[in-house]
Swiss-Prot record:
Induces the formation of large intracellular inclusion body, organized in amorphous and crystalline arrays. Presumably the main cause of the stripe disease observed in host. Its main location: host cell. This is Major non-capsid protein. It is found in: Host cytoplasm. Belongs to the tenuiviruses NCP family. Keywords: Host cytoplasm. It comes from the Viruses. InterPro entries: Major_non-capsid_tenuivirus. One of its GO terms (cellular component) is host cell cytoplasm. It comes from Rice stripe virus (isolate M) (RSV).
């Protein structure tokens, strides 16, 4: 019997149903002018800064979403959450913990220097209560703060390891707000 070895490998492409060419064409020029189409499918090709640029482009796409019945929504927008989850996992080092909730208290404290003027623990627990602009600000701040770091820190274990799933839960309501 062959041993199965567990590896920490995050696959971004292909996400079934996602039209990568349309995704590329939908990204703002500040993003698409600095990446190639294969960069969207293979994060190994790009630097940490480029990964952040792509994630910011995805937040832009989610913020400026079309109607849910639009072909663009069906081929790109409804897949943005899964794409962001995978891409952020890769940015943070590939280790992803979907089984536990983020430590809201610790995350709240981490956000104080940048978003302390308005962010509340209640908003962090219930992102659908935030306005479209507040969700975008929070997502942009997460991207700005995200980095691959040592996995033996409390911050990594309680916040960043769980962040891809949390990020997905924040970007989802953005796709449905008008």
């Amino acid at each position: 019997m062959q041993d199965v070895q567990r590896t920490v490998e995050v696959s971004v492409g292909p996400i079934v149903g996602l039209d990568y060419t349309l995704l590329y064409d939908t990204l703002p020029e500040t993003v698409s002018d600095n990446i190639t189409l294969p960069d969207l499918k293979d994060p190994e090709r790009v630097t940490e800064d480029t990964k952040k640029l792509i994630l910011k482009g995805c937040v832009y796409i989610a913020y400026h979403h079309p109607l849910e019945t639009d072909t663009l929504f069906i081929k790109v927008h409804k897949h943005i959450t899964e794409f962001c989850h995978s891409f952020l996992s890769h940015l943070l080092g590939g280790e992803d913990d979907d089984n536990a909730l983020i430590d809201i208290g610790l995350f709240f404290n981490m956000l104080q220097p940048s978003l302390g003027g308005w962010i509340t623990k209640n908003f962090l627990r219930h992102p659908n209560r935030m306005s479209k602009d507040q969700i975008k600000l929070l997502l942009d701040q997460i991207i700005k703060m995200a980095k691959a770091e040592s996995s033996d820190t409390e911050e990594y274990e309680k916040v960043w390891k769980k962040m891809p799933t949390y990020f997905e839960s924040i970007i989802q309501p953005l796709l449905h707000k008008t």
